[in-house]
Swiss-Prot record:
Catalysis: reaction(s): ATP + H2O + 4 H(+)(in) = ADP + phosphate + 5 H(+)(out)
E.C. designation(s): 7.1.2.2
Alphabetically ordered keywords of this record: ATP synthesis, ATP-binding, Hydrogen ion transport, Ion transport, Nucleotide-binding, Translocase, Transport
Function summary: Produces ATP from ADP in the presence of a proton gradient across the membrane. The V-type alpha chain is a catalytic subunit.
GO cellular component, as recorded: proton-transporting ATP synthase complex
Family: Belongs to the ATPase alpha/beta chains family.
Cross-referenced InterPro entries: ATP-synt_VA_C (IPR055190), ATP-synth_a_Xtn (IPR031686), ATP_synth_asu-like_sf (IPR023366), ATPase_F1/V1/A1_a/bsu_N (IPR004100), ATPase_F1/V1/A1_a/bsu_N_sf (IPR036121), ATPase_F1/V1/A1_a/bsu_nucl-bd (IPR000194), ATPase_F1/V1_b/a_C (IPR024034), P-loop_NTPase (IPR027417)
Taxonomic lineage of the native organism: Bacteria, Pseudomonadati, Spirochaetota, Spirochaetia, Spirochaetales
CDD domains tied to this protein: ATP-synt_F1_V1_A1_AB_FliI_N, ATP-synt_V_A-type_alpha_C, V_A-ATPase_A
Protein's recorded name: V-type ATP synthase alpha chain
One Pfam family cited in the UniProt record for this chain: ATP-synt_ab_Xtn
GO function terms (MF aspect): ATP binding; proton-transporting ATP synthase activity, rotational mechanism; proton-transporting ATPase activity, rotational mechanism
Disulphide-bonded residues: none
Length: 575
């Protein structure tokens, strides 16, 4: 029999409950008020009193309201049908909620995440008599563009023998597809779906590997200078309006991955609506089908209850780990982890815990680290390799990278793509600062070449600061040429037009080719009689390179521009 209790105190979305029986941390409970059951989670236990955060508005909850505990952790349902869906933080399907509730969400309405009526064409890959363990494949169904493997539930701890398995055909997620037997002779029915607690990492794999293979984003500044590896982690901090969301959306469209999961936790509703409108219309360049076919969106906008923001981040990473277990490459984009941290700060304040820096909880770093640590590249039991790459945007107030959330994130990620107000105001997009950003991963271009090119950016910035004080006349022609070359590298290679059909996504082959051209210009010695002549020449090169960026790779126009560029360089270079 489930434990019962009653409300003895309410403070915002924190409810204090007096219990009659045993409870455990993170147990899910329902507060019964005004004929509705409001979902909540235990976050502190003190004697016979527990504190729970309610995932809904707590208006109307009063002292004496009854509470029922479920004896379960907060879980997600895993199975075919997750892709193309839009969920809230508690995995309620928003399109179905809209049909039931209209434009405004009602409290206490919880729907099943997966469609129980839809039939999936199951093809078995195992047979009666096979010995299986948790995470092993029984067969697969086609879900959009993905071979969705039907697995032994991850919570099964022993080895089992398959005693029954259905023939190929159409089945719903609740229909029995196999029966397995353990060593004691007990039989277990297997369906296509099962539940898993969101705060428990899925560890049904043989070993974790060190991320080494680059995950191509087709954004030049990232792939060349600040690469991200498959199974790695990266963060995108930046002030409001610097282009974090656009950069994440461009990455999700063009990244070299099988499944994209977007966790919009605490972002403005307008940006989420934009994603929901655009994604079904966009074509996946790899398959020619809608991008939505390989995407799952978990959205908890800033207008939704604060407590569910934390749940939305964990829901997203759990779904990502589930698809990783199929041997797929997953990209998870959390936008924005700052809002999630603010939700933690709010709850910590209500619990009257000792605050850390800027009133964030003292355990902020360990919570952020435990989230990013769930990324990784793993070898599965059958030898396949799957990965979850996690990218979180951070929204520090005023673009201050010294604030606690950014600093806690920097300690655990492998790449830092810092967006700056200075670059976004100058319309230099993506507004990633080439001087402040860094990456620990290997990219698509030789590191010695990229370090040489980056040295020009550093020198060019120093010379630019000098010119602000002494003017152009106060520096030598050689220094001025270094400055012009650094500006050429910035405008022709680092900057990219996300709204141009050709320049929006650049293949690794084209990146190598174009970088070699720019690298050749940086290494070539030129001689000019004055600064005006130098500026005119570099501007001519720059325009030529920009035209090449907007031309199809190696077509007639591209080759013509490249030939003209070569003649220009040969005309002015010092032999």
């Amino acid at each position: 029999m489930n434990t019962k209790g009653k409300v003895v105190g309410v403070n915002g979305n924190l409810v204090t409950i007096e219990v009659e029986g045993s409870v455990f941390m993170n147990e899910v409970l329902f507060v019964k008020t005004a004929g509705r059951n409001l979902k909540a989670e235990v976050i502190r236990i003190r004697g016979n009193e527990v504190d729970a955060q309610v995932f809904e508005l707590t208006k109307g909850i009063s002292v004496g309201d009854l509470v029922e505990f479920t004896d379960k952790l907060l879980t997600v349902e895993l199975g075919p049908g997750l892709l193309t869906q839009v969920y809230d933080g508690l995995q309620n399907p928003l399109p179905e909620l809209a049909i039931q509730c209209g434009f405004f969400l009602e409290r206490g309405v919880y729907l099943r995440p997966l469609n129980k009526d839809k039939k999936w064409n199951f093809k078995k890959t195992s047979k009666v008599g096979d010995i299986v363990i948790a995470g092993d494949f029984l067969g697969f169904v086609i879900e959009g563009t993905v071979h969705h493997q039907i697995m032994i539930p991850f919570y099964k701890r022993d080895s089992y023998k398959i005693v029954e398995i259905v023939s190929d055909g159409d089945y719903s997620i609740d229909e029995q597809i196999a029966v397995i037997e353990d060593d004691s002779g007990m039989r277990h029915n297997i369906t296509m779906s099962f539940h898993w607690p969101v705060k428990v990492p899925i560890t049904n794999y043989k070993e974790r590997l060190i991320p080494s293979e680059p995950m191509l984003t087709q954004t030049r500044i990232i792939d060349t200078f600040f690469p991200v590896a498959k199974g790695g982690t990266f963060c995108i901090p930046g002030p409001f309006g610097a282009g974090k969301t656009v950069l994440q959306q461009v990455t999700s469209r063009n990244a070299d991955v099988d499944v994209v999961i977007i966790a919009a936790c605490g972002e403005r509703a307008g940006e989420v609506v934009e994603t929901l409108k655009e994604f079904p219309e966009l074509m996946d360049p790899k398959t020619g089908k809608s991008l939505m076919d390989r995407t799952c969106i978990i959205c908890n906008t800033s207008s939704m209850p604060v407590a569910a923001r934390e749940a939305s981040v964990y829901t997203a990473i759990t779904i990502g780990e589930y698809y990783r277990q199929m041997g797929l490459d997953i990209l998870l984009l959390a936008d924005s982890t700052s809002r999630w941290a603010q939700a933690m700060r709010e709850m910590s304040g209500r619990l009257e815990e000792i605050p850390g820096e800027e009133a964030f909880p003292a355990y902020l770093e360990s919570v952020i680290a435990s989230f990013y640590e769930r990324a990784g590249i793993v070898v599965l039991n059958n030898g396949d390799i799957g990965s979850v790459t996690v990218g979180g945007s951070v929204s520090p107030a005023g673009g201050n990278f010294e604030e606690p959330v950014t600093q806690a994130t920097l300690k655990v990620v492998g790449a830092f793509h810092g967006l700056t107000r200075e670059r976004s105001d100058a319309r230099k997009f993506p507004a990633i600062s080439p001087l402040e950003s860094w990456s620990k991963y290997k990219g698509v271009i030789d590191q010695k070449k990229t370090e040489y090119a980056r040295s020009f950016l550093v020198k060019g910035n120093e010379i630019n600061q000098m010119m602000k004080v002494v003017g152009e006349e106060g520096i030598s022609n050689d220094d001025f040429l270094i400055y012009l070359k650094s500006e050429l590298l910035d405008s022709c290679y680092l900057q990219q037009n996300s709204f141009d059909s050709i320049d929006a996504a650049v293949s690794s082959e084209r990146q190598n080719y174009m970088f070699d051209i720019v690298y050749n210009i940086l290494k070539t010695n030129f001689e000019f009689s004055d600064k005006l002549q130098a500026r005119d020449f570099i501007n001519e090169l720059r325009q030529n390179l920009l035209d090449m960026n907007l031309s199809s790779f190696k077509d007639h126009k591209f080759n013509k521009l490249e030939h003209a560029l070569g003649e220009l360089i040969n005309f002015k270079k010092v032999i």
